[in-house]
Regions:
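Short, charged beta-turn/beta-strand-edge "cap" motif at the junction between a beta-strand
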Residues: 13, 54-59
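Short aromatic-glycine-enriched beta-strand elements
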Residues: 16-21
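Short alpha-helix capping/helix-loop boundary micro-motifs
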Residues: 30-40
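Short nucleic-acid-contacting surface segments enriched for D/E, G, S/T with interspersed K/R
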Residues: 38-51
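Short, Lys/Arg- and Gly-enriched loop/turn segments at beta-strand edges
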Residues: 57-68
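Active-site metal-binding core of divalent-cation-utilizing nuclease and nuclease-like domains
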Residues: 71-81, 92-149, 169-172, 227-236
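Nucleic-acid nuclease catalytic cores
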Residues: 155-165, 169-204, 226
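Domain-level recognition of nuclease-like catalytic cores that cleave nucleotide substrates
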Residues: 192-251
Length: 251
């Protein structure tokens, strides 16, 4: 995906979760929308260089959106919702390799009693009507996308960056789908150029770490994609290793 021209600025503070005060090069102080629900640990240091996109809607209350921040470890896209767009493009281009060969891709698919997957991949070779996950079958793969911005150690990214009951529930639902005969995958989309491998954030959310391990043990596929990121574009360019999927594995 490509970015329109971004405005450079200096971060003053991030607050109330969705707001960020930023100073522009001309000295103006603006309030930007911060499209990230996480803790943004290491990605919200005052004084950091940031990049903002202008709002397309002139009636929007906040005229700017915080897109990226420069950290000592690398450039980070903090607009976490863009991970879905990046992954959709990657899937269409054949990443991850083990998810190649699907006939159709559909976003935001409901399954089970009240669950929703980011994507469903249909590996059936013949069109069979609307792509609706009525019951689990191996030819229908649910895909859950998780944006990774937290770097815990040199090159090691971790998810989540705050306790997430919702993310834990997602893993349990994917595990249930697989146990019923379906196929499911979680893709960690790494939006930080300094990260070269990913692990569950055991010390932050042990419940999620355990849910991920249990899901993996029962057949949920786990992948990570690293991006090439600049102020002009962001594209998933490579698969990264996922560690910590077995007890005691944190390499």
């Amino acid at each position: 995906m490509r970015f329109d021209t971004l405005q450079q600025g200096t971060l003053i503070r991030r607050y109330k979760r969705f707001l960020a005060d930023v100073t522009l090069p001309n000295g103006d102080l603006v309030v930007a929308h911060c499209p990230n629900t996480g803790a943004m640990t290491g990605c919200a240091e005052p004084g950091s260089t940031v990049f903002l996109s202008p709002a397309n809607n002139p009636k929007r209350k906040l005229a700017w959106t915080l897109e990226m921040i420069e950290t000592p470890q690398g450039l980070v896209c903090v607009h976490s919702a863009l991970a879905n767009k990046v992954v959709a493009e990657a899937l269409e281009k054949g990443l991850p390799l083990d998810l190649q060969g699907f006939a159709r891709l559909k976003p935001e698919v409901k399954y089970g009693a009240s669950s929703r997957a980011d994507f469903m991949l249909d590996f059936r070779r013949e069109a069979v009507g609307p792509l609706i996950a009525v019951q689990p079958i191996p030819e229908l793969a649910l895909v859950e996308v998780k944006a990774v911005t937290l770097q815990q150690a040199s090159g090691l990214g971790a998810f989540p960056d705050a306790v997430s009951v919702r993310a834990t529930r997602h893993m349990e639902e994917l595990r249930g789908w697989v146990l019923q005969g379906g196929r499911a995958a979680v893709i960690f989309c790494v939006l930080h150029t300094g990260i070269n491998r990913v692990a569950p954030a055991e010390t932050i959310d042990p419940n999620y770490a355990q849910a991920l391990r249990s899901a993996f043990a029962d057949g949920v596929e786990v992948y990570a994609l690293g991006v090439d990121l600049s102020v002009d574009a962001m594209v998933a360019a490579r698969e990264l290793p996922v560690v910590g999927l077995a007890e005691g594995d944190s390499s």
